Amino acid sequence: LSDYKKLSEDADEYGIFRFVITGGEALLDRKLGDLIDTLDPYKHLIILDSNGWFFDDEKAKWFADKGGYKVQISLDSMNPADHDAFRRKPGAHAKALRAFKAAKKAGLQMLLSSCLIKDRVFTEEFEEMMAFCAEEEIPLYLTLAKPVGSGKGHDEWVCTKKDVDQLKFLEDKHQIFTHMTPSYGHPGKCITVKGINTVNHDGEIMPCPFMDMSLGNVTKEPLSLILDRGMKNKWLGPYRDECIIGENWEFIKFHNDKVNEWSEETPYLPVPYEKGFALTDKVPE
């Protein structure tokens, strides 16, 4: 916890004010309450990712009383059978819907988080999800399927320009958004390093939760050095109008090749900085 306290203090120097606690399922961590206290909800917005299985009225009130700000509940489909099959857990859909009610009762902010695969944005099921979110006044946050991790080898899941264009069209009509949605008068851009950084349990900093490559370890180096390193990387520093891990096939190949090479040595990810991002060019100074 001392490492997280130092991270919280370092984040203040950068004006970082949000921490999203994810997993696995973070609610299974017996030290979650201590972690929330350490990250300091009086200074930072504490957001919780959950599949909803354990997020009932009691847990929602507990999180709100701890100073929690928002809960993001994952829902893969409005069709209960499809959602439960994907989660490999009968009843998962019902538990997710219960979680939304619990969060609302506790006065928490909410998001419905869902993944878009190719062509889903044109389906009746997706229309039903947008209607549900509108009726319940829940913002719909969408992530594009990435050909990495469990999606590796499933290039057919990756959204095309046609999908992305339709999504942008719907953003103007519904309360739906992605990390690429224009905001505060700025056009949508990839937010690696600039708007998001992922910290794992060992202190490794990844520039995106969908990347398995590290920029450095915050328990061994200052956060400022790691973020500066990321901003100077040719893939991560410059602003891009694409999701680099979801749309840029040159980077996707580089990423997956390095992950495969590292996995031949050890099953433990992420790929260390020296074996991955350090091998790419820097932004010209």
What are these regions (language model features)?
Residues 209-285:
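Flexible mid-to-C-terminal extensions adjoining Fe-S/redox cofactors in radical SAM and related proteins
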Residues 1-69:
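Conserved alpha-helical substructure of the radical SAM core
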Residues 66, 74-76, 81-194, 201-202, ...:
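Radical SAM enzyme [4Fe-4S]-AdoMet core and its adjacent flexible, acidic
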Residues 29, 58, 81-82, 86, ...:
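Residues that scaffold the ATP/ADP-binding catalytic core of kinase and kinase-like folds
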Residues 28, 56, 92, 118-122, ...:
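Alpha-helix N-cap/loop-to-helix initiation residues
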Residues 22, 49-51, 113, 274-277:
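Structural motif
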